[in-house]
């Protein structure tokens, strides 16, 4: 337990950064008259913190068991020792404060995008549309892609949708590696702060300034 308390103290500024980002979104919602129902998504998303915490701990134990089997060791005994040492192992004890901070930031980024329509109504879609045409030689990028594949349009779009979702798994793997495998606190802190700042600036403020609904929903606006 002392190790977990020590990790909360170590990551206190990251947790505070997350709380400040939430407070800024809350103040913006009140100032611009946004419905407080927007915060329901935040509560729903943030309620998954404990579940994700348990899931990632389970992933860590699976990794430990597989590593033991690879080294021809007793996997059950190795996992039992890992569980006993959990609260003393700095990498694992750090997971709870990291999840609280990072999931707060992720939730607030999602919430800030819902506030765009109230703070800075969508206005950049035409510019992005013209930029796409200019960058791709006078045609839209999806037209080039559809001309290169033997599949029909629906199948191609489904493949693209699945490919797009792959970024989420890449992100989870990156965080999992930094927290559990790297073991270098300096690398971990640097990665967490860099990713947090990128989420807030690129996913929050940039999305607010360059407000656009995207090509899929543009016709609805």
Residue ranges and their predicted role:
Residues 1-221:
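Terminal transmembrane helix and immediately flanking juxtamembrane interfaces
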């Amino acid at each position: 337990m002392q190790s977990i308390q020590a990790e909360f103290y170590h990551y206190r500024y990251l947790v505070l950064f997350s709380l400040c980002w939430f407070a800024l979104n809350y103040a913006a919602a009140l100032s611009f008259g946004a419905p407080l129902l927007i915060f329901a998504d935040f509560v729903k998303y943030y309620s998954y913190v404990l579940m994700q915490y348990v899931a990632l701990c389970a992933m860590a134990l699976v990794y430990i068991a597989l590593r033991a089997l690879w080294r021809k060791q007793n996997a059950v005994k190795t996992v039992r020792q890992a569980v006993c040492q959990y609260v003393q192992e700095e990498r694992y004890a750090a997971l709870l404060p990291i999840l609280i901070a990072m999931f707060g930031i992720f939730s607030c980024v999602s919430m800030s995008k819902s506030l765009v329509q109230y703070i800075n109504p969508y206005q950049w879609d035409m510019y992005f549309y013209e930029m796409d045409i200019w960058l791709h030689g006078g045609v839209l990028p999806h037209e080039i892609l559809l001309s290169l594949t033997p599949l029909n349009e629906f199948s191609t779009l489904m493949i693209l949708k699945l490919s797009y979702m792959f970024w989420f798994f890449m992100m989870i793997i990156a965080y999992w590696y930094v927290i559990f495998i790297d073991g270098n606190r300096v690398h971990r802190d640097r990665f967490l702060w860099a990713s947090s700042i990128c989420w807030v600036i690129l996913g929050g403020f940039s999305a607010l300034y360059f407000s656009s609904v995207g090509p899929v929903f543009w016709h609805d606006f």
